[in-house]
């Protein structure tokens, strides 16, 4: 098969591993920088051009779209979908997962456990907003932040009010969430492919830090999850419509709570922690499902 990997940087660990896994299984891998693509949108034969050439003959696409290029990256991916190319994750599912508020609303609708969350732009009663999520300590997040950036732990009512008012002064949309103290600065990353959790790791925040992101100095280790945690992770990915996802959850006194569903989960930390060939599993998923799509397409021609 000819498999395209939408990635801005071919030297990134995840991109390299996916290319290696493609080639190890006898497939052709092509790295495509979505920002350098341009599209011909028409009702007869939509196409994508890259470096002066038509991008044709692809059997599947693996989208590794950075948060900063979500709009354009999803536009390019949508064009591939219009050309009837199989995508590991569809553009609409990626868009859902990148909108933090929308993703939480979808999880809420499906009854998936998550921290109590408030959303505001210019609340006229900041103390009531804080009270709504259980009071201090609480977590305050910028809606557009990634990798732990724009996330603040406010330990007192006064600190919370000050941070919220500061963000309001920047005309930023914010979320406030209850702080899950019993999680102890740790979360669990569940790697979902299809309807299965195929790998898990525990991420522990560094000393003096409450954010467990590996980019923030957190550490990763093996962890065994419960059947309830497994079911919750799969349900969260399904709520977004994602076939491949990194689902982050917290262990709380009332069960697993979803923090985030990532449509382009990194491979480096979890492959190192679990010693599993996750890149290979993604390619295996493509082999099984792209073939099904192609068979269905032939039936309807």
Curated annotation (Swiss-Prot):
Q: Where along this sequence does the record place binding of Mg(2+) 1?
A: 248, 260
Entry annotated with the keyword Cytoplasm: no
Binding positions (Mg(2+) 2) = 260, 262
Annotated cofactor note: Binds 2 magnesium or manganese ions per subunit.
In which residues is Mn(2+) 1 bound? 248, 260
Q: Does the keyword Kinase apply?
A: no
- Source superkingdom: Bacteria
Give the cofactors, semicolon-separated. Mg(2+); Mn(2+)
UniProt-listed Pfam families: RimK, Rimk_N
Could you say which residues form the signal peptide? none
Sequence similarity: Belongs to the RimK family.
Q: Which SUPFAM superfamilies match?
A: Glutathione synthetase ATP-binding domain-like
Q: Name one GO biological process term.
A: translation
Chain ranges of the ATP-grasp domain: 104-287
Q: Which amino acid positions bind Mn(2+) 2, per UniProt?
A: 260, 262
Q: Where does ATP bind?
A: 141, 178-179, 187, 211-213
- This chain belongs to the protein called Probable alpha-L-glutamate ligase
Q: Name one GO cellular component term.
A: cytoplasm
**Alphabetic keyword roster:** ATP-binding, Ligase, Magnesium, Manganese, Metal-binding, Nucleotide-binding, Protein biosynthesis
A Gene Ontology molecular function term for this protein is: ATP binding
As recorded in UniProt, its EC number(s) are 6.3.2.-
